[in-house]
């Protein structure tokens, strides 16, 4: 079992491993850990047969208007409970956390699910 603190550290580690060319583009975004997705998060899930591992809440970079000055930060939530349920050991959990962080950042950059390998 991975504690919440260790899980948060693994999310931070995944962010720290981003190539600088992508990390430098992250602006006005918060990456947080939540235990479970909310009902409204689940409503956004197209395939109810799978666990929701993370979600991007915001406006993708490709759809932003550049004249907006004061925007609330976008948010990526990584869901601890679902990730721990779909993985069998610590190594799998670490890989899934990394893959989920990368996937949700893909949405931030404007990619849809079909356009991502993760």
Residue ranges and their predicted role:
Residues 100, 104-108:
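Catalytic glutamate of the conserved HExxH
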Residues 1-96, 108-118:
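Active-site rim/adjacent substrate-binding subdomains
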